[in-house]
Amino acid sequence: MDLKNHFLVAMPSMNDPVFTRSVIYICEHDSDGTMGLRINQPVQISLKGMLDQIKLDNPSPIIFPQTLSQPVLNGGPVSDDRGFVLHYPKDNYSSSIEVTEELSVTTSKDILATLGTEDQPYKYLVALGYSGWDAGQLEQELSENTWLILEADSSVIFDTPIPDRWRRAIEILGISPVNISSEVGHA
């Protein structure tokens, strides 16, 4: 099963403090492993604060300052000093990976210079770090009933308030978090 462009949603019973109530957007899944971005855990810095710290030269005027007030997200515990921008494709950035026809992940600074300007992607989120699994590791966690899987919905990523994304992802499955059991049954 290819999990690219799916959500991993932490089961309510997950006791790993790193991933409790996490929603992870899977960007890559193949025989070598899995890479995704957690989309529902902000860090204590805004996008403007992060951009001020890295001192990018921005030749275009800031015309959408409100977009720079959004929080940066904690994408996961791996390489948490690296930035990842999940966005609707626009232009050609130096280091982008197309996840779907609609979504790309970019890791180069050239996209950061567009944020807040007329050249910014239509919709985007910025995360520091990513969530990663070695070959077979995620499949093992799935067999242990650690995660729920569902096809990704861009409205959860870009239009749902951050604190509501976990609950919303579960609701898309048609279930309530209180009705989920961590026990695996056998018929």
Curated annotation (Swiss-Prot):
Organism ancestry: Bacteria, Pseudomonadati, Pseudomonadota, Gammaproteobacteria, Vibrionales
CC terms in the record's Gene Ontology section: cytosol
Matches recorded under SUPFAM superfamilies: VC0467-like
Cystine residue pairs: none
Name of the protein this chain belongs to: UPF0301 protein VSAL_I0547
Record family assignment: Belongs to the UPF0301 (AlgH) family.
InterPro entries hit by this protein: AlgH-like
Organism: Aliivibrio salmonicida (strain LFI1238) (Vibrio salmonicida (strain LFI1238))
Listed Pfam families: DUF179 (PF02622)
